[in-house]
């Protein structure tokens, strides 16, 4: 599996180029998510109760030859609202929105949302302080990308 270097997105112009490169995630699906809080309980049962990492990694697979599978990393996660479709409905993403508001990056699984729409949006919404992504090659299909070594 080839995992190229991460590409960090910081500006509205970089978001626009990224979204155009991904065709606004048309004909895509959220395959997997992995969250790292930073909090843990150690071997002696002492707790480190601080969410000082808050990193969400999300794998998207697309029906497109270029960048068919990407991993998106949301750093300093502030909000994750996950609204998965159940098995009676299809879950493909037809369009998406990514914007910067108040210094945070928002990603939603619906297109043409404005800053004013974010609070009322009932689909999947992610808000984080930072964002980066990378293309993942030779890993299409149902096999899990994030798997435990235990």
Describe the residue ranges of each PLM region.
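Surface-exposed, interaction-prone regions used to assemble/regulate multi-protein complexes
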Residues: 1-150
């Amino acid at each position: 599996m080839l995992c190229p270097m991460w590409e960090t997105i910081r500006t509205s112009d970089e978001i626009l180029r990224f979204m155009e490169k991904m065709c606004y995630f048309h004909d895509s699906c959220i395959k997997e998510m992995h969250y790292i809080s930073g909090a843990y309980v150690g071997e002696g049962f002492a707790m480190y109760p601080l969410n000082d990492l808050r990193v969400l990694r999300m794998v998207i697979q697309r029906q497109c030859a270029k960048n068919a599978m990407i991993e998106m990393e949301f750093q300093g996660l502030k909000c994750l609202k996950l609204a998965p479709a159940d098995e009676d409905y299809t879950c493909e993403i037809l369009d998406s929105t990514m914007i910067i508001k108040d210094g945070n990056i928002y990603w939603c699984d619906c297109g043409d949302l404005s800053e004013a729409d974010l609070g009322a949006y009932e689909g999947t919404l992610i808000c984080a302080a930072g964002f980066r992504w990378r293309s993942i090659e030779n890993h299409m299909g149902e096999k899990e990308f994030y798997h435990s070594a235990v």
